[in-house]
Amino acid sequence: MSLSLPSPSTNGSRLTPVESRHAPLFGFALLTVSCALASFALACATPFAAFAVIAAAMLPLRPALLVVTGAWLVNQGIGFGALHYPIDGNTMLWGAAIGIAALAATAAASAVLRSLPQNSTPLVLAVALICGYGVYELALLAATPVLGGADSFTAAIVAQIGVSNAAWLIGLVAACEIVRLVNPFKRGHIAS
């Protein structure tokens, strides 16, 4: 069984679960709920590269960056508020580094999605994830000389988090497709 996604809409989006006017709000809701789930389940391994690809596939770059920033803020709020991350300079700087890395991943995913052909969406989403994840991890690795933690960048750990991001991307694409199929926001749809 192959994934058959609709062709991109006139605004260039690869994922169109809702009309383009609802896309920023839907993207924000999808990623903040997903981020809350991931933050409690995975703590520091929140799949921001997958979030970046979903946002970039649904939205132009600026709204995608805003949506990913919102997801990052949710992650930080849960981390410091509910999970009781230590409130110290190093932890806060790592939080900022994660936010910067997530935004860099979003920009990279957006560039990939804009530059590759509009057909073959599943393959292009995979390429966008690989590029976005690479940028995300490199941005975090660049912070290690100042913040420490280089021992967390072993091949096994990076691969495990990469697989987690791939699984989250598949799940988020599936959620988008389900919403597209049962979209309550379609024109002419009357709520019962």
Question: What are the functions of these language-model segments?
Answer:
Residues 2-59, 63-66:
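Hydrophobic transmembrane alpha-helices
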